[in-house]
């Protein structure tokens, strides 16, 4: 690994932890708050994972701790892992109260995703617009005075844009290329905005392209442009964006399941584990839009935490809820040993899955290099 690569990871990993730790703590705070409101005894709220480094505070029943492994946090409830005689134990709470406490972490992560996307939509309101990536020598674009970085606002009055938070929407550069190609050999009215924000209206005669030439003679890319936002529109974008992000995450999880079942020796497309996410963070922070993209990445990660924890797979919250329901239906004694085995197997499978994803992350990072 080169020196630049070492600096890349030394920068990326701490930033990822600064994103993930608050998201996990928000999740755990949901469990903590609802447990308190439900009258369930909370023994410990920990930042990081044991071994314990320091007790940073306590009240009449809860110890607040700082732990040595800085990878999240946890809430320890009386009677969560085993039966307890304490009437305020989690194991003695009614099923509805247990389910509310388990669902609170997912709910907090969903709300966090919406809030972060709201901030992105209101403060930045990022829009994707087709842009000029490069200009070919002797092309109609060069003759018209186009430069790299210019925004292609419209062709014959027709423009192509999309909201960055509209996940899954078509890249606006594609219909722009198609429109230019459809008008090859014709004179079109082209509206262009330069990097200073000045717009020009140009009459440009497009060529009939040969080989790798384009009709205009530019490499059409996509630029992120900030536009004025308002809170009402931002709220709609935030809710819609979170919903669409959940849909894409669900599709990705389905693709991973299919990949594992059919060809586990190949990397799952479009899916990253901790190493891949750290690499993405490292790439994002070097971009001009780094702060906005980090906020958006945090929102997507929060939505991802919510959806993954909702899955009915022990030891995730959804799996715990499923076990609670089974215990209610069949009785605690009938599923006691099975519950322990289920958690152990589920945890082992979860760790194996993370290791599997991370293996391909490391391979990709090693071949591409930061």
Residue ranges of each PLM-predicted region?
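C-terminal transmembrane module of polytopic alpha-helical membrane proteins
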Residues: 358-370
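Transmembrane alpha-helix interface/packing and boundary motifs in multi-pass membrane proteins
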Residues: 261-264, 285, 301-316
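PDZ peptide-recognition modules
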Residues: 2-12, 81-96, 104, 108-269, ...
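Small-residue-rich helix-interface/hinge motifs
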Residues: 7-86, 308-330
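Membrane-interface alpha-helices at helix entry/exit sites of multi-pass transporters
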Residues: 333-341
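Final/C-terminal transmembrane alpha-helix of multipass membrane proteins
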Residues: 340-361
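Membrane-interfacial loop-to-helix junctions in multi-pass transporters
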Residues: 8-12, 287-297
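Alpha-helical transmembrane segments of multi-pass membrane proteins
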Residues: 20-24, 109, 113, 300-309, ...
């Amino acid at each position: 690994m080169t020196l630049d690569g070492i600096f890349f990871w030394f920068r990326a990993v701490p930033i990822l932890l600064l994103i993930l730790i608050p998201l996990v703590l928000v999740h755990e705070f949901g469990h903590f708050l609802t447990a308190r409101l439900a009258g369930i005894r909370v023994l410990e709220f920990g930042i990081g994972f044991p071994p314990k480094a320091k007790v940073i505070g306590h009240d009449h029943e809860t110890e607040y701790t700082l732990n040595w492994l800085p990878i999240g946090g946890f809430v320890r409830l009386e009677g969560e892992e085993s039966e307890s005689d304490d009437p305020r134990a989690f194991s003695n709470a009614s099923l509805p109260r247990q389910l509310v406490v388990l669902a609170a972490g997912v709910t907090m992560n969903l709300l966090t995703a919406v809030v972060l996307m709201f901030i992105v939509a209101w403060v930045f309101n990022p829009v994707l617009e087709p842009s000029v990536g490069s200009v070919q020598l002797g092309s109609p674009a060069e003759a018209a005075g186009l430069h790299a970085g210019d925004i292609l606002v419209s062709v014959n009055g027709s423009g192509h844009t999309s909201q960055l938070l509209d996940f899954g929407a078509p890249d606006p550069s594609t219909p722009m290329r198609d429109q230019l190609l459809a008008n090859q050999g014709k004179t079109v009215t082209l509206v262009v905005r330069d990097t200073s924000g000045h717009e020009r209206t140009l009459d440009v005669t497009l060529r009939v392209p040969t080989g790798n030439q384009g009709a205009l003679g530019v490499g059409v890319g996509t630029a992120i442009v900030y536009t004025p936002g308002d809170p009402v529109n931002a709220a709609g974008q935030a809710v819609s964006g979170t919903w669409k992000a959940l849909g894409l995450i669900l599709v990705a999880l389905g693709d991973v399941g299919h990949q594992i079942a059919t060809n586990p020796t190949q990397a799952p497309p479009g899916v990253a584990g901790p190493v891949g996410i750290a690499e993405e963070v490292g790439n994002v922070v070097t971009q001009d839009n780094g702060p906005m993209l980090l906020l958006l990445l945090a929102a997507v990660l929060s939505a991802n935490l919510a959806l993954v924890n909702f899955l009915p797979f022990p030891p995730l919250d959804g799996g715990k809820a499923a076990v609670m329901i089974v215990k209610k239906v069949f009785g605690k004694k009938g599923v006691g040993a099975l519950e322990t085995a289920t958690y152990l197997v589920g945890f082992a499978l979860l760790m194996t899955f993370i290791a599997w994803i991370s293996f391909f992350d490391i391979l990709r990072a090693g071949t591409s290099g930061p």
